Amino acid sequence: MAELSSLAELGAATGNTNTQAAAPVHVQKLDKSGRAYATGKRKNAIARVWVKPGSGKIVVNDKEFATYFARPVLQMILNQPIIASNRSGQYDIVATVVGGGLSGQAGAVRHGISKALTYYEPALRAVLKKGGFLTRDSRVVERKKYGKAKARRSFQFSKR
């Protein structure tokens, strides 16, 4: 058998000339109004998010986001994907979120904003993926087991 020095020669020898797989092409996904729509999830919260070009206004459940998420930590969580993609003040964001508590809701809106930004501007996908904003945080509360006080905590043990 002849020695092959490269993958191209191997492809030519076997008749397979396409040695490179086609990379997935991400295209812009917009609705009829020119908005990008995405859903985000975190714990028990589900957020529906719409993104369109604008002045940077963020509305959550018909309230200004600073009113709905009063704690600065939650506001920071919401702004993370916008700051990471360097798009602050360029998009108006409208979100409706149901279920869970405030922390889970903030995480769900963040996830939805990240996905909607990638639908509107596919070039941002690499930046947001590297920051971990596109990954769904799958951690949920562990269920309580029978014979235990909580999910893992046992009842107090008395030796005598």
From Swiss-Prot:
Top-rank lineage group of the source organism: Bacteria
UniProt source species: Mesorhizobium japonicum (strain LMG 29417 / CECT 9101 / MAFF 303099)
GO cellular component, one term: cytosolic small ribosomal subunit
Protein name: Small ribosomal subunit protein uS9
NCBIfam families: PRK00132.1
GO molecular-function terms, A-Z: RNA binding; structural constituent of ribosome
Family in the record: Belongs to the universal ribosomal protein uS9 family.
GO BP, sorted A to Z: translation
Keyword entries, A-Z: Ribonucleoprotein, Ribosomal protein
